[in-house]
Regions:
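Sec-dependent N-terminal signal peptides
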Residues: 4-14
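Sec/Tat signal peptide C-region and signal peptidase I cleavage site
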Residues: 16-20
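OB-fold single-stranded nucleic acid-binding module
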Residues: 21-130
């Protein structure tokens, strides 16, 4: 019985650890290459091309702190969600931080990875304190 409790506790802690997300500002993205994180910041500019939508967080291109890349093949499955302009809006994006030639980026495959950052959000309050 004791072993069953111990095994259950270990499994529960493992699941909690896996589901926990780190929330970081765009300026720290380069420190988290290869990690799945949630990054919250302002979209300073947006590039809409036929094959890709790119959001630039933390600064205008080429001085952005993070790029968010949405390929056309993924954009087509989202029924117009990525046709919206995100420029000037505060968002949170969740995904694995990758290292690209222009710095860190996150590839977005579905709209669930991008959420608006609400003004009364605890994350927004933390960012404004820093």
């Amino acid at each position: 019985m004791k072993n069953l409790f111990l095994i259950s506790a270990i499994i529960l802690l493992s699941v909690c650890k896996v589901s926990a997300q780190k929330i970081i500002p765009a300026k720290d993205a380069a420190k988290h290459i290869g990690e799945k994180v949630t990054i919250c910041d302002k979209v300073c500019s947006q590039s809409n091309k036929a094959f890709m939508v790119t959001l630039f967080l933390g600064g205008d291109r080429p001085n952005q702190l993070l790029r968010v890349a949405i390929r056309f093949s993924d954009r087509a499955k989202t029924k117009g969600y990525f046709d919206t302009s995100f420029e000037g809006k505060d968002i949170c994006v969740t995904g694995v931080v990758l290292n690209g030639r222009d710095g860190p980026y996150i590839r977005v495959n579905n709209p669930e990875q991008i959420k608006p950052l609400l003004l009364d959000s605890p994350v927004k309050q933390i960012q404004t304190l820093n």
